[in-house]
């Protein structure tokens, strides 16, 4: 068998066969070396592989160095007014303030329910330097006020016209011993005596009496009768109705 002529086919045909049937190279005659083939075409990219396992935790980083504070910024524009908040709890009472100025007079009030329709009042004086008669009635001969005429300066007696509670009082000047008695319908109610220790003295006394219509009240003296009524040494007898029945 002549190898030199049978192992040299045409180059074009051999190249085609080599590309189509590369495995057949192993079946070629061991004594015959073929021409190296052309590089193949690039294959398509493969798929992404699976994620790898989580790696170990790294070492702590180097602490950062704080930076320097920047310059202060400019003041911003005022914001919109906020909504009104809820009322807070009531605070403690403050201290009283100073009194305010006096206000104008108010309107007249309504008439009260109680109105005293009946009145009785008098004040009379005894204007004389002569002593009254011993053991007798004392007349007060000058009226300061006696609008109802309930005290009679001629008789020296007060006559009750309006039943009720009355108050009687006397202030008498004296230049000698004096005992002043208040009588109600000839019955002695009070007696005030004063013994002289100076040239002139004053004696006083008062009493509340409930009177009925027609009752009479007057003043009298006993044998101590040093009552006077002069300028600077007045003797006064007064009475008035407190509460009518």
From Swiss-Prot:
The modification 4-hydroxyproline is found at residues 36, 39, 42, 45, 63, 81, 96, 99, 105. The C1Q subcomplex is inhibited by sulfated molecules, such as triterpenoid sulfates, heparan sulfate, or chondroitin sulfates. Keywords: Collagen, Complement pathway, Disulfide bond, Glycoprotein, Hydroxylation, Immunity, Innate immunity, Repeat, Secreted, Signal. The modification 5-hydroxylysine is found at residue 75. It comes from the Eukaryota. Residues 115-245 form the C1q domain. Gene3D superfamilies: 2.60.120.40. This is Complement C1q subcomponent subunit C. It comes from Rattus norvegicus (Rat).
């Amino acid at each position: 068998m002549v190898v030199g002529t049978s192992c040299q086919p045409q180059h074009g045909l051999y190249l085609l066969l080599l590309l189509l049937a590369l495995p057949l190279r192993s079946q070629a005659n061991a004594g015959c070396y073929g021409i190296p083939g052309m590089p193949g075409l690039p294959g398509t990219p493969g798929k992404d592989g699976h994620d790898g396992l989580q790696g170990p935790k790294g070492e702590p980083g180097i602490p950062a160095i704080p930076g320097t504070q920047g310059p202060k910024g400019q003041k911003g524009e005022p914001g919109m007014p906020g909504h009104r908040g809820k009322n807070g709890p009531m605070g403690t009472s403050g201290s009283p303030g100073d009194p305010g100025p006096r206000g104008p007079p108010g309107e007249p009030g309504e008439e009260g329910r109680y109105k005293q329709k009946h009145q009785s009042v008098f004040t009379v004086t005894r204007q004389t330097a002569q002593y009254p008669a011993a053991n007798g009635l004392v007349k007060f001969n000058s009226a300061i006020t006696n609008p109802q005429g309930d005290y009679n300066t001629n008789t020296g007696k007060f006559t009750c016209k309006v039943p009720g509670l009355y108050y009687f009082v006397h202030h008498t000047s004296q230049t000698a011993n004096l005992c002043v008695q208040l009588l109600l319908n000839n019955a002695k109610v009070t007696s005030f005596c004063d013994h002289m220790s100076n040239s002139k003295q004053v004696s006083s006394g008062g009493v509340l009496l409930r009177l009925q219509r027609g009752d009479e009240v007057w003043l009298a003296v006993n044998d101590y009768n040093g009552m006077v009524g002069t300028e600077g040494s007045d003797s006064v007898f007064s009475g008035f109705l407190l509460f009518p029945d």
